[in-house]
Amino acid sequence: STCRVRLVVAPDRPPAPLGFDPLLAAVEFSFKVGCPSEFDCVVPHECTPQELPAPHIDYLARDYASFRRLMLDRMALTLPAWHERNPADQMVALVEVLAYAADQLSYQQDAAATEAYLGTARRRVSLRRHARLLDYPLGEGRNARAWVVLEVQAAADGALLPGPDPPADRPGTLLLTKTRLAAGSITTADIEQIAEERPTAFETMHDLRLYAAHNQIVLYTWGDEQCCLPQGATRATLRNTANRLQQLAAGDCLLFEEVRGAASGRTADADPAHRHVVRLTSVRFTEDPLFADDPDDPTNPLGPRLQIAEITWDVADALPFPLCLDLVEDDDIPGHKQPVSVARGNLVLADHGATIVEQLPAVGDTQRYRPWLSLAPLSRQGRVAGRRGRMQLFDAAAAATSALHAADGQDLPAIRLRQDGPTGPMWLPQPDLLGSSRFARTFVVETEADGRTFLRFGDGRYGRRPAGALLAIYRIGNGTAGNIGADALAHVVGISGVSSVRNPLAASGGREPEPSEQVRLYAPEAFRVQRRAITEADYAAVADQQSQVGRAGATRAKAPPRSPAASRRRRSASRT
């Protein structure tokens, strides 16, 4: 049982003595020993709060109008004497400001849920990140490429046409399409005069030494006035008059072009489809033992022999059509014969886009640095695998045909950054930062659907945090807008002594960014693409994907491998 002890003044006076707390003057206890209780000795005192009626909340209110109506209805209940609805009223203005803020917050909440999934994402940046998690490279488009042939004057013989030099931040030579200015060389000051015409800009992709002797080269026919280079030809002979072609070497590119109609001899009747670019694999200078280098007496056995150059090119550059080499009457000079087709040097590869230099905003210390470029669209350059597997813009040792093509999924934006001035460290773009160390000066280019381009930097773990002033050097020009027609280019900027600039073939390779619906369709299935080779059929399938292979087969080596390395070598040989 529970006993109670209470302090009193006297038995007949129950109040507590003076100086004692009345609540603490009594205590209850029991005489049980060693019997612990599972309950707390504190006596609970619960005071149930008064329940107020819950307000009616319309959870369907998600925009400005509904939030404004909801708050005005609530104020009609809490302030029944207030009936003002004039927009100039202070209370109404406060309600509308809160409705605007609620509308923005609601949008952010909806956007966070929407962008969280590939099937519902609307921003292109979100689609790109979701696709990256599925190992699917989202296509951001690619700029076009074109072969450009230049004719130079004798005063500019041996001049250098510079290409890009990224370490020195030097862009390629600027080429422009036709304008009201005369074709050929123009200055940088002339660009301001034609700015309103918005000419399409290209830039050279490599250095080129210009020679006047390469403007037009006659193909040698060994005395035959009616002959042609057959379809599929990979060799020809050039007339090396006065040894003017001594600068021609393997690796140079030549254009074979029909300049007159084979039947009429008129230049207007030349077939523009009979133009083809090849890259020389060998050049051999020799002479014709039967003919002399004397136009008045070519059969003179005592005169100096006619100098020629025998050239060859890759099978991949084989002529796709028969090239007529007949000699026909010249319309301008009666009795004088001119060749139907000629070869031209001074050929350079160029791609779509003009270089822009822009100072980026200052790097802040409080929030994530994510600047955006003021001009668009950013150029995306295709790349190919070189001889050693390293990715590059084009292979200067491969066939000329391959220079206009690039590998899928290997495009990189044409942009780089300089930190703290033109001589500071360089920042380079990467497809993502997952493989970047915390010291790597790399960044990711993210483009929205409207063409705006943002730059995303590392967080100190995956990629270095940016610091200092950043200078952006990038190119604008992308997509099918660069697929200009043949003979559209007409100007070269900053190079004197050039009388003619043109692209004999239409530019190609420009493609638009991949549509969002296509990303949603293909990205979830990207893992089904086979990228391994284990069985004989796998190796044959990989070999069939090469453009140079017509049909492939693979067999397993009969001899057992002596080591794993030997097994790999045999398998590689079987694949080849």
Where are these regions (language model features)?
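Signature of Asx- and small-polar-rich beta-strand/turn repeats characteristic
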Residues: 1-576
